[in-house]
Curated annotation (Swiss-Prot):
Domain note: RodE has three extra-cysteines, two of them within the characteristic hydrophobin Cys pattern, and no signal peptide; however, its hydrophobicity profile is conserved with class I hydrophobins represented by rodA, rodB, and rodC.
InterPro entries: Hydrophobin
Subunit structure: Self-assembles to form functional amyloid fibrils called rodlets. Self-assembly into fibrillar rodlets occurs spontaneously at hydrophobic:hydrophilic interfaces and the rodlets further associate laterally to form amphipathic monolayers.
UniProt KW RNA-binding keyword: no
Name this polypeptide is given: Class I hydrophobin rodE
A Gene Ontology cellular-component term: fungal-type cell wall
Native source organism of the sequence: Aspergillus fumigatus (strain ATCC MYA-4609 / CBS 101355 / FGSC A1100 / Af293)
One Pfam family linked to the record: Hydrophobin
Disulfide bonds: 43-126, 59-120, 60-95, 127-140
Lineage: Eukaryota, Fungi, Dikarya, Ascomycota, Pezizomycotina
Role played: Aerial growth, conidiation, and dispersal of filamentous fungi in the environment rely upon a capability of their secreting small amphipathic proteins called hydrophobins (HPBs) with low sequence identity. Class I can self-assemble into an outermost layer of rodlet bundles on aerial cell surfaces, conferring cellular hydrophobicity that supports fungal growth, development and dispersal; whereas Class II form highly ordered films at water-air interfaces through intermolecular interactions but contribute nothing to the rodlet structure.
Regulation: induction: No expression is detected in sporulating cultures, nor in vegetative cultures or during infection.
Length: 145
């Protein structure tokens, strides 16, 4: 009879049931798999929960309140002959289509998580107003990740 590897040697737990010891690498692999599954599920659950259509979902470097626009946003609006007092919703600056990479960056660096340190220079938003080639986008609502 061949000896059993040490990591599979039987032990008794507190209920006197036979239990095999699992190698530490199995536990780490299981933890990583669970983490990846939860992150994926959170991505899909958040995106699917939004009522925003794919064409309106954007990733902007800045989202600004229309009542508190910085000089750059005000200058762009003037060039486009748009009165800032008529705006509803946030104003997105330097926006592009919301990609998986942008969404993952937002999800992994949001406050309260310890998955990745750092920050994203991005804000996920649903913008139903005019989009001026991503330079400035109107009628935005931030998507909570």
């Amino acid at each position: 009879m061949h000896p059993r590897p040490e990591h599979l040697s039987p032990t008794l737990n507190h209920n006197h049931r036979l239990k095999l010891k699992q190698p530490a690498t199995t536990s780490r692999m299981l933890a990583r798999t669970i983490l990846a599954t939860l992150v994926s599920a959170a991505c899909f659950a958040t995106v699917n929960a939004q009522t925003c259509s794919a064409t309106n979902a954007v990733c902007c470097q800045q989202l600004q309140d229309p009542d508190n626009l910085n000089a750059d946003a005000l200058n762009l609006l003037r060039l486009l002959n748009i009165n800032p007092n008529t705006l509803t919703g946030a104003v997105g600056l330097t926006c592009k289509r919301l990609t998986e990479a942008c969404f993952a960056c937002l999800l992994l660096t949001r406050p309260g998580t310890s998955l990745v340190s750092g920050s994203c220079n991005a804000n996920a938003a649903c913008c139903t107003g005019n989009n001026y080639n991503g330079l400035i986008v109107l009628g935005c609502t931030q998507i909570q990740v």
